[in-house]
Curated annotation (Swiss-Prot):
Domain (Peptidase S1): residue spans on this chain: 121-401
Family annotation (Pfam families): Trypsin
Key words of the record: Disulfide bond, Glycoprotein, Secreted, Serine protease homolog, Signal
GO terms under cellular component: extracellular region
Alphabetized InterPro entries for the sequence: Glutamyl_endopeptidase, Peptidase_S1_PA, Peptidase_S1_PA_chymotrypsin, Trypsin_dom, TRYPSIN_HIS
Domain of life: Eukaryota
Family per record: Belongs to the peptidase S1 family.
Glycosylation (residues): 87
Main location: secreted
Comp. bias regions, Basic residues: 186-204
Disulfide bonding pattern of the chain: 151-167
Signal peptide annotation: 1-17
Protein name as it appears in the record: Inactive serine protease 35
Length: 406
């Protein structure tokens, strides 16, 4: 009951303030279009990179303030993208940006009311483990997924998961295990300790073999000698377990997948995974990230699978302290495993009384950033800007015609 009050009542109390309250509404506007120009076949990756939270030191908000705004050709290069398929083949798609008005200004930052703090879990842990199936199997918590590489992600369509790029690629190569990448969705078990399974025998075998938790690879059921069992381990009735689905293809912006041409840019630490099987639960739509002043209470929300809470979905909310054009610094208590989670807001629908949640950033994790020549680590999220919205929308729909507004 306490969790319910925290999640839902907070939105109602915003309307009880003064008449000068900000307009917390999703405002749709025409955005630039990212259009595919040509696709080039590349050599297959080796899938030998080690999965890590971040590669070296990245350019954070203070570092970005000293950089000039990128040109149109640079943006088109950053937004061009790699696609790697389940059979190991890889392509590079060059894009063109249409309808963009460039502003000849440097990257700017906006500071919140509070000074930033170094990352850790402070005093009383403010995270909530979602254990009640009434929450766990319902929106918005059922949009959170787990990657077999150890990260989290968010379902943004029946067939697509948004996550952090570093969960599958270190900037030079794809990480070990990403060639047979799987996505796990928490499901409740039915009577008898098994979840319902539909579809072909082949897809069931994939789900069951993939459903073996990476943390417990040796679990198995008793079987007759000489006969292979296709059935996964039994789970106690009423307990959630992961249903695993193979990833069909992975899209990563060239701003992150630099190869030998440079270090990955933190601004582009996001990736989209296309699943082999559509998911039936409700997904969360994308939204363009508003400024701090447009956040109700200055807060953001996200749920993920923190490593210190074994296979539990963990929810948290916190304040944003500072933002640039592409990044957010925030105070959320989080541990490894939650990176890649979709950060969302709850704002009003235009012209309606209804409130709607949308994903406006991807949690990149505890990153080492360059702050005036000194290395410091902070909680960082990558904002979904109009251009990134257009790019991710192109990945989801396959054409720019469906991505005119965001």
């Amino acid at each position: 009951m306490l969790l319910w009050l925290i999640i839902f009542v907070s939105g109602w109390t915003l309307s009880l303030g003064s008449e000068t309250e900000p307009d917390f509404t999703w405002h749709l506007s025409r955005i630039p279009q990212v259009v595919s120009e040509k696709t080039i076949h590349l050599a297959s990756p080796t899938f030998q990179a080690d999965a890590a939270a971040v590669k070296a030191t990245v350019c954070g908000i203070e570092c970005q303030e000293e950089l000039p705004a990128p040109s149109l050709s640079q943006l088109e290069d950053f937004l061009s993208y790699e696609t790697v398929f389940e059979n190991g083949t890889r392509t590079l798609t060059r894009v063109k940006v249409q309808g963009l008005v460039l502003e000849p200004t440097q990257n700017s930052s906006i500071k919140g009311a509070r000074p930033r703090r170094r990352r850790q879990v402070y005093g009383t842990d403010s995270r909530f483990s979602i254990l009640d199936k009434r929450f766990l199997t319902n929106f918005p918590f059922n949009t959170a997924v787990k990657l077999s590489t150890g990260c989290s992600g968010a379902l943004v369509s029946p067939n697509h998961v948004l996550t952090a790029a570093h969960c599958v690629h270190d900037g030079k190569d794809y990480v070990k295990g990403s060639k047979k990448l799987r996505v796990g969705v928490l499901k409740m078990r039915n009577k008898g300790g098994r979840k319902k399974r539909r579809g072909s025998r082949r897809s069931r075998r994939e789900a069951e073999s993939g459903g073996q938790s990476p943390e417990h690879p040796q679990e198995s059921t008793t079987q007759r000698p000489g006969k292979k069992s296709r059935r996964g381990p039994r789970v106690a009735q009423g307990r959630p377990s992961f249903q695993w689905t193979r990833v069909k293809s992975t899209h990563i912006p060239k701003g992150w997948a630099r190869g030998e041409n440079g270090d990955p840019a933190l601004d582009f630490d996001y990736a989209l995974l296309e699943l082999k099987r559509a998911q039936k639960q409700q997904y969360m739509e994308l939204g363009v990230s508003p400024t701090i002043s447009k956040l109700p209470g200055g807060r953001i929300h996200f749920s993920g699978f923190d490593n210190d809470r074994d296979d539990q979905l963990v929810y948290r909310f916190c304040s944003v302290s500072e933002e640039s054009n592409d990044l957010l610094y925030q105070y959320c208590d989080a541990e490894a495993g939650s990176t890649g989670s979709g950060i969302y807001l709850r704002l009003k629908e235009p012209g309606q009384k209804n409130w709607k949640r949308k994903i406006i950033a991807v949690y990149s994790g505890h990153q080492w950033v360059d702050v005036h020549g000194v290395q410091k680590d902070y909680n960082v999220a990558v904002r979904i800007t109009p251009l990134k919205y257009a790019q991710i929308c192109l990945w989801i729909h396959g054409n720019a015609a469906n991505c005119a507004y965001g």
